UniProtKB/Swiss-Prot annotation:
One Pfam family matching this protein: HSP70
Protein name: Heat shock 70 kDa protein cognate 1
Gene: Hsc70-1
Family: Belongs to the heat shock protein 70 family.
Gene Ontology MF: a single term: ATP-dependent protein folding chaperone
Keywords, ordered alphabetically: ATP-binding, Nucleotide-binding, Stress response
PROSITE patterns in the cross-refs: HSP70_1
């Protein structure tokens, strides 16, 4: 009997992807945009619902109606301390319904078999840890740096935070292959330009406990 291919699905907090193991190797399946990962985002406009890359690409212009990080809410109550902490970083609103959080990647792994249905064979990991955790550390660090340099608190401005988060995510990716990344954002908040840099060593220091926990 020929061996059936094994399919792996990573429903991540920030990005999702699908891979198939066959012919002795893993192949990542591209989405309809040709990308090997798909942002775990959904957005709502007056006329349509956007998913993945299309949703993430318009987040700066439509932050209140663009949902991400939703996986963090699974199995938690609205008054959970982690939910309340996460909500401070979201431009969209969450509310309580029967004690559960509702809205308009965690680091976890499950092994399943597919034979007359799905059967979970094993699961492990930190279901609350995702890429956004690392981004949040850098965002918070730069919010403090901006206030220290310019005497302005951008922490309550959703659009400014979204632009800063996008720049932090880009810098994080750069640091995976370089020792330093530049962050340049024109007119970030109240007309003030923000130019700074972050080293890989500093990023690792900000996220040291998260790295050790994995």
């Amino acid at each position: 009997m020929p061996k059936l291919p094994a399919v792996g699905i990573d429903l991540g907090t920030t990005y999702s992807c699908v891979g198939v193991f066959q012919h002795g190797k893993v192949e990542i399946i591209a989405n309809d945009q040709g990308n090997r990962t798909t942002p775990s985002y959904v957005a709502f406009t007056e006329s349509e619902r956007l998913i993945g890359d299309a949703a993430k690409n318009q987040v700066a212009m439509n932050p209140n109606n663009t949902i991400f990080d939703a996986k963090r809410l699974i199995g938690r109550r609205f008054d959970d301390a982690t939910v309340q902490s996460d909500m401070k970083h979201w431009p969209f609103e969450a509310f309580a319904e029967n004690g559960k959080p509702r809205i308009r990647g965690t680091f976890d792994v499950s092994v399943l078999t597919i034979e007359d249905g799905f059967e979970v064979k094993a699961t492990a990991g930190d279901t609350h840890l995702g890429r956004e955790d690392f981004d949040n550390r850098l965002v918070n660090h730069l919010v403090q740096e901006f206030q220290r340099k310019h005497g302005k608190d951008l922490g309550q401005n959703k659009r400014a935070l979204r632009r800063l988060r996008t720049a932090c995510e880009r810098a994080k990716r750069t640091l995976s292959s370089s020792t330093q990344a530049s962050i340049e954002i024109d007119s970030l908040f109240e007309g003030v330009d923000f130019y700074t840099s972050v080293t890989r060593a500093r990023f690792e220091e900000l996220n040291g406990d998260l790295f050790r926990g994995t």
